[in-house]
Amino acid sequence: MKLPFIFLITLLIFVSSCTSILINESSDEERTYSFSPTTSPFDPRSLNQELKIGRIGYCFDCARACMRRGKYIRTCSFERKLCRCSISGIK
């Protein structure tokens, strides 16, 4: 009974010490990130296009939600994530 218990405790100590060594080594590394506009894959035009698509998609979903309620769309603000429908219904 004592032998499996001692083996288990020894194994846990070994695993925990290896884990702490690996964590310390990975946190001690210095990570430097450089930004060079000439080599960067970042394209502001594509980001702008994605934002336009997101805005159109959000307002489209807003309009669909208002129409499901039988109302007109009153306000759609992508930046504030605001979607308001009109008070009066569709005639």
Curated annotation (Swiss-Prot):
List all annotated glycosylation positions: 24
Which family, according to UniProt? Belongs to the DEFL family.
Please identify the protein, giving its name as recorded. Protein LURE 1.3
Instruction: Record the organism.
Output: Arabidopsis thaliana (Mouse-ear cress)
Disulfide cysteine pairs (residue numbers): 59-76, 62-83, 66-85
GO cellular component: a single term: extracellular region
Q: What does this protein do?
A: Pollen tube attractants guiding pollen tubes to the ovular micropyle. Attracts pollen tubes from both A.thaliana and A.lyrata.
Biological process (GO) annotations held by this record are: pollen tube guidance
Localization, UniProt: Secreted
**Tell me, how does this one assemble?**
Binds to PRK6 LRRs.
Which N-terminal residues, if any, form the signal peptide? 1-20
User: According to its UniProt record, where is this protein mainly located?
Assistant: secreted
Q: Where is this region: PRK6 binding?
A: 68-88
**InterPro entries named in the record:** DEFL_AtLURE1-like
Per UniProt, the keywords (alphabetical) are: Disulfide bond, Glycoprotein, Secreted, Signal
Keyword field contains Heme? no
Expressed, tissue-wise, as follows: Expressed in the pistil. Detected exclusively in the synergid cells.
